[in-house]
A protein has these predicted regions:
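C-terminal interaction segment
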Residues: 1-40, 46-109
């Protein structure tokens, strides 16, 4: 791919490039990597940084979103529209992985 995201997912069928990539920003990377993902046609990029999830979706009209390399910052995933982002964020922030998984499962049922 030219860049290695922390996680990547193809939704529905396998493809050459994933539909969704997730980056955990610790010291470097971040929004500037959108330029690379845009060239690859990655539909959605999530950045986890400082206990916050930022979601960017690639738009057809790249000129309208030049500041973010053709991506629009959005509050709800368009690749996974049924996903409750608030529940996901709360679960990620839970210090107990077991309790986090349980709370997330209960929240989606």
């Amino acid at each position: 791919m030219g860049v290695e995201p922390d996680e990547s997912y193809c939704i529905g069928t396998d493809k050459e490039f994933p539909d969704l990539v997730i980056e955990v920003v610790v010291t470097s990377g971040g929004i500037n990597r959108l330029a690379i993902y845009q060239q690859l046609g990655i539909q959605e990029v999530w950045f986890w940084s400082e206990d916050r999830l930022a979601i960017y979706h690639l738009r057809q009209n790249l000129d309208q979103f030049t500041a973010n390399f053709g991506y629009e910052a959005i509050n709800r995933s368009q690749v996974l529209p049924e996903l409750n982002i608030e529940l996901l964020t709360e679960s990620i922030q839970n210090p107990s992985p077991l309790a986090a998984a349980k709370a997330f499962r209960e929240g989606i049922l």
